[in-house]
């Protein structure tokens, strides 16, 4: 990395950002505009029917968000003219060839773009297989093919997980060979069968979700999301040619740690479901090993690493992987989150819909399925059966209590099933490449460290959870 400001690499540059209405993309757009106001253009790809709709979406879902308050204060009355000069919404969708962009502006984009930042993805763990395949696999391929035409753009494991690309066809369990084209054909054929059988939309959705989880686990991945993202990476590595390729692999992304708004976040993420469930009095137990490490990293650190990596890798023609994680340098156990949640709600008790204070209790974390299921039977299943009989005898007068208990049971079971691969995860993500990147920045760009910090060792986890993340979850997610 050359010895001058990292932000300088983006001066007079044009960047295309996909998935631009998403959490990470918003942080990226805000940070680039604030760190390098002399960036030439940011093209924001959004799903929209036309340019007018795209512009409206960007205004409502990106620029109009609280996240941009600091940038707005910096520019004052000139904020809107600054945005109009730098930010260009583009209607399109990565699932289509040429990203679904109108032919009339394609040539201009191919001529101007210096960087393509793809953060478009469907991140639901149990997404429909066809949807995840289209976005996370074929979408990534479409973005790569688009980038090649730009003039200036040249699972279930244990132990140490290396920062290396996936080999084409690689599986995590050695269970046969993964043929991506066969998977694409398989999901398309299954969908045709469902349509031929005149299956309802609900049946098709359930079948596709189950198919995704089944195929993921067959090849050793815990869910559809990480499986399809891995296949997307394989295609990128296989098809990139001499195109410079930087792949950022963040672990569980949490709220902003420092900059610009500590605690800011959008959409419920892995650990947030536990916090929200506890806040609403719905979580009475969980499944996992409290002594194991939960690998979490704040969203602003992920974006900072993206920016530094882009600058460092600008003139390289190879591929590199960066794990943006905390398990190697600053591990935090699930027990710390448990403790922080209990401490926070002991000091700041919540009020339920009935106006009563929700009691703060320590939530047990069961280390095996047998003890978890025993607890759920005694705590929920048996009482539900008794209440159901009483409800029949009392002419449905306590139906609301039955429904409430059933909802709590379903919530806890679904949470346990969905997140068990993470609450029992015994791996540790190697971060040698990320560490080298950080050390290079420490050596040559010390003045930018406060703005572009991505060192997980700087995080005090108890302070972060108690004073930043949990309050952020309650403010932005817990309605």
Q: What label would you give each PLM region?
A:
Residues 311-418, 430-436, 440, 445-454, ...:
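Mid/C-terminal beta-alpha module of Rossmann-like enzyme folds, strongest
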Residues 193-263, 271, 315-322, 327:
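Conserved beta-loop-beta element that borders a ligand/cofactor-binding pocket
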Residues 115, 127-148, 154, 168:
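NAD(P)-cofactor binding segment of oxidoreductase domains
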Residues 139-143, 228-236, 302:
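Conserved catalytic Lys-bearing alpha helix of Rossmann-like short-chain dehydrogenase/reductases
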């Amino acid at each position: 990395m050359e010895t001058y400001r990292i932000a300088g690499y983006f001066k007079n540059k044009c960047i295309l950002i996909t998935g631009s209405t998403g959490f990470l993309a918003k942080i990226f757009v805000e940070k680039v505009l604030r760190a390098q106001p002399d960036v030439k253009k940011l093209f924001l790809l959004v799903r929209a029917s036309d340019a007018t709709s795209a512009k409206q979406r960007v205004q409502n879902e990106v620029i109009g968000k609280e996240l941009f308050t600091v940038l707005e204060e910096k520019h004052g009355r000139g904020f809107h003219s600054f945005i109009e000069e730098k930010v260009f919404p583009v209607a399109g969708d990565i699932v289509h060839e040429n990203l679904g962009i109108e032919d009339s502006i394609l040539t201009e984009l191919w001529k101007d773009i210096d960087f393509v930042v793809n953060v478009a993805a469907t991140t639901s763990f149990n997404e429909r297989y066809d949807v995840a395949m289209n976005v996370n696999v074929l979408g990534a391929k479409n973005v790569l093919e688009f980038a090649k035409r730009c003039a200036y753009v040249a699972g279930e494991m244990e132990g140490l997980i290396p920062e290396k690309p996936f080999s084409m066809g690689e599986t995590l369990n050695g269970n046969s060979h993964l043929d991506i084209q066969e998977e694409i054909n398989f999901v398309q054929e299954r969908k045709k069968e469902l349509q031929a059988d005149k299956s309802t939309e609900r049946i098709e959705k359930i079948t596709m979700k189950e198919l995704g989880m089944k195929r993921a686990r067959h090849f050793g991945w815990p869910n559809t999301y990480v499986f399809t993202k891995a296949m997307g990476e394989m295609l990128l590595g296989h098809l990139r040619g001499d195109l410079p390729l930087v792949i950022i692999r963040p672990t569980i992304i949490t709220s902003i740690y420092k900059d610009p708004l500590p605690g800011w976040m959008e959409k419920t993420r892995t650990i947030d479901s536990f916090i929200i469930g506890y806040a609403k009095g719905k979580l009475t137990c969980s499944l996992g090993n409290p002594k194991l490490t939960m690998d979490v990293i704040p969203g602003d650190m992920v974006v900072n690493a993206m920016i530094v990596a882009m600058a460092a890798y600008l003139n390289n023609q190879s591929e590199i992987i960066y794990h943006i994680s905390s398990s190697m340098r600053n591990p935090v156990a699930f027990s710390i989150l448990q403790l922080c949640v209990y401490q926070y709600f002991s000091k700041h008790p919540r009020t339920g819909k009935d106006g009563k204070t929700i009691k703060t209790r320590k939530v047990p974390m069961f280390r095996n399925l047998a003890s978890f299921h025993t607890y759920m039977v005694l705590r929920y299943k048996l009482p539900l059966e008794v209440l159901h009989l009483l409800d029949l005898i009392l002419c449905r007068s306590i139906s609301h209590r039955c429904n409430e208990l059933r909802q709590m049971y379903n919530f806890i079971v679904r949470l346990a099933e969905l997140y068990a691969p993470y609450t029992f995860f015994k791996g540790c993500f190697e971060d040698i490449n990320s560490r080298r990147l950080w050390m290079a920045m420490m050596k040559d760009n010390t003045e930018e460290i406060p703005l572009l910090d991505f060192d997980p060792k700087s995080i005090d986890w108890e302070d972060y959870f108690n004073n930043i993340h949990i309050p952020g979850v309650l403010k932005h997610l817990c309605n």
